[in-house]
């Protein structure tokens, strides 16, 4: 499978700092420009991958972060091969954030100094069950049965078990410092999921919510606070 990414470099200097911006489901690398621009202005190289089944990458299904975790790992090692001194920050959005957290469960190399997870779910099973309940409140079929059918369809069509897509399990094995970000008015992934991820993580971690922000809207509702939290968090990791 061929995977595509954009690699952007700051115009004035060669940097060992690399930000990997991982987009959300049903999106693509080109829609993460607001994040790439900030990192470029801070002197980072920026890698913007198209996840499998998105943008210019190949793939016949959307993995909602699960198989994407392995692609994130591949991009990390591609960066390290180009620059063994690279200092890598992962910045994931929604299911892209889930992919980054799931990658933490795969034991990230020491070149990765920080993970920024914006609006990740706790587990795909829990998120799917919640959405099924919202969509079928007046239906006679129980949520558990609908979820079982959906699990079987995903297993046969995409080849993975959605029950294994569990960032909340992965963060129990995380070692890379992680910043959890979430809008407190998120109607797609409830902010309570972010709070639970923060509580369960065993790595050094911080947590910030954005008042009135919906799904992935923290960077738009309060960009100054958003980037202040991100930049200060990363700066502390560089000092260690």
Q: What does each model-identified segment do?
A:
Residues 173-175, 180-182, 186:
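Short beta-strand/loop motif that positions the catalytic acidic residue
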Residues 35, 167, 176, 190-199:
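Short alpha-helix in the alpha/beta-hydrolase fold that links the catalytic acid
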Residues 25-38:
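The serine-hydrolase catalytic nucleophile loop
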Residues 213-227:
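Catalytic histidine-centered segment of alpha/beta-hydrolase-like enzymes
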Residues 36-58:
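Conserved alpha/beta-hydrolase
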Residues 184-189, 216-217:
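Acidic catalytic loop of the alpha/beta-hydrolase fold
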Residues 102-161, 169:
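Hydrolase active-site cap/lid region
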Residues 62-83:
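Alpha/beta-hydrolase active-site loop
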């Amino acid at each position: 499978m061929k995977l595509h990414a954009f690699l952007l470099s700051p115009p004035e200097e060669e940097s060992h700092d690399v930000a990997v911006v991982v987009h959300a489901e049903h999106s693509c690398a080109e829609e993460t420009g607001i994040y790439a621009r900030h990192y470029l202005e801070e002197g980072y190289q920026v890698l913007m991958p198209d996840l499998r089944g998105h943008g210019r990458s190949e793939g016949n299904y959307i993995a909602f972060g699960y198989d994407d975790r392995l692609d994130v790992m591949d991009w990390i090692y591609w960066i390290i091969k180009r620059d063994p001194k690279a200092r890598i920050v992962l910045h994931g959005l929604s299911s892209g954030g889930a992919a980054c957290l799931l990658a933490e469960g795969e034991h990230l190399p020491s070149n990765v100094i920080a993970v920024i997870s914006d609006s990740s779910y706790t587990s795909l099973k829990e998120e799917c069950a919640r959405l099924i309940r919202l969509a079928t409140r007046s239906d006679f079929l129980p949520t558990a049965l609908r979820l079982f059918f959906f699990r079987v369809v995903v297993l046969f069509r995409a080849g993975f078990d959605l029950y294994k897509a569990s960032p909340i399990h992965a963060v129990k094995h995380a070692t890379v410092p992680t910043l959890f970000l979430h809008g407190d008015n998120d109607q797609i992934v409830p902010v309570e999921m972010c709070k639970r991820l923060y509580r369960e993580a065993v790595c050094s971690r911080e947590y910030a919510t954005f008042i009135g922000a919906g799904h992935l809207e923290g960077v738009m509702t309060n960009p100054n606070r958003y980037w202040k939290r991100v930049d200060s968090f990363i700066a502390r990791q560089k000092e260690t």
